[in-house]
Amino acid sequence: MDLPAPIHDILLVSLGSGLIVGGLGVVLLTNPIYSAFSLGLVLVCISLFYIPSNSYFVAAAQLLIYVGAINVLILFAVMFMNGSEYYNYFHFWTVGDGFTSLVCTSIFFSLIATIPNTSWYGIIWTTRSNQIIEQDLTSNVQQIGIHLSTDFYLPFELISIILLVSLVGAIAMARRE
């Protein structure tokens, strides 16, 4: 999407703030339904990040798969859970919670200190991407596959990490019962 620079910056800042607010909502809200809705906000913001980079198909696929299917499945699972038993196990600030919050805040502040000082323009993400893209790709599916494995590799890896963490959290909640 060819947007003027100020509008593009405002869009990215608003999507980034939506990601931060949604992520904090997932972690800090005690009601699991509100946490699932916050996860939906995070997934919507991630899918909307693809629109300024002219990847409309990827954005639509993210919305359909992650928000439309996975988040609805998480909401159904949370709603079928017995809420009263869940809150009996909930204690404020155990030793593990304190240690986890200390580790997470240290990682957060180290990333804040590292990211602005890193020169991202000299990094070569893949070595063969230019050779592959120079070939005559006739099919849109081939072009999407090449872009997903080269240009958009990092966002899909981040989504897989988010899904892995949510799966581990669901298993940990299920093992308590």
From Swiss-Prot:
Which EC numbers does the record give? 7.1.1.-
Q: What is its main location?
A: plastid
Which GO terms label this protein's molecular function in UniProt? NADH dehydrogenase (ubiquinone) activity; quinone binding
The gene is ndhG
Q: What does this protein do?
A: NDH shuttles electrons from NAD(P)H:plastoquinone, via FMN and iron-sulfur (Fe-S) centers, to quinones in the photosynthetic chain and possibly in a chloroplast respiratory chain. The immediate electron acceptor for the enzyme in this species is believed to be plastoquinone. Couples the redox reaction to proton translocation, and thus conserves the redox energy in a proton gradient.
Can the keyword RNA-binding be found in this entry's annotation? no
Q: Where are the transmembrane segments?
A: 10-30, 32-52, 61-81, 92-112, 152-172
Coiled-coil ranges (or none): none
Its Gene Ontology cellular component terms are:
chloroplast thylakoid membrane
The UniProt entry, under Pfam families, shows: Oxidored_q3 (PF00499)
Source organism of this protein record: Nymphaea alba
Instruction: Report the locations given in the UniProt record.
Output: Plastid, Chloroplast thylakoid membrane
**Subunit notes for this chain?**
NDH is composed of at least 16 different subunits, 5 of which are encoded in the nucleus.
- Membrane protein topology class: Multi-pass membrane protein
The name on file for this protein is NAD(P)H-quinone oxidoreductase subunit 6, chloroplastic
Keywords attached to this Swiss-Prot or TrEMBL record, sorted alphabetically, are: Chloroplast, Membrane, NAD, NADP, Plastid, Plastoquinone, Quinone, Thylakoid, Translocase, Transmembrane, Transmembrane helix, Transport
Family from the record: Belongs to the complex I subunit 6 family.
Reaction catalysed by this chain?
A: a plastoquinone + NADH + (n+1) H(+)(in) = a plastoquinol + NAD(+) + n H(+)(out); a plastoquinone + NADPH + (n+1) H(+)(in) = a plastoquinol + NADP(+) + n H(+)(out)
Name the enzyme's class. translocase
